[in-house]
Amino acid sequence: HNMPEGLAVGVGFGGGDLGNAVALAIGIGIQNAPEGLAVAFSLLTIGYSRKNAFLIAGATGLFEPVMGFIGVSIVTVFLPILPIALGFAAGAMLFVISHEIIPETHRRGHENWATGGFTIGLLIMLSLDILLG
């Protein structure tokens, strides 16, 4: 799901509204830290060395800047498709959440933690939207 996140940030910056683009980039960046730690810890538990777990977790995030560059490039050249591109990026992220992340949290019995994390994340994003305009 790093690809649609990168695409969303790239499209946001390509659209010219710097305030919203920065808020989106900060929001996605904030959630990338615990996500990367989760990947690294998962790799450690199955026997990877700390170095390899760190490198692999970092490598999973490399798709974001690549897709960000693609998003900026497409929207810069074809500005009229900005709403469509933002809709596609948002839809891709919602699909990943609804079809992968939510079922996984409920399958393992962490419904309350997952709901709390979702609520806190939503409040942070709303706060950033209000503060950064």
Residue spans for each PLM region:
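Intrinsically disordered, metal-sensing/regulatory segments
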Residues: M3-G133
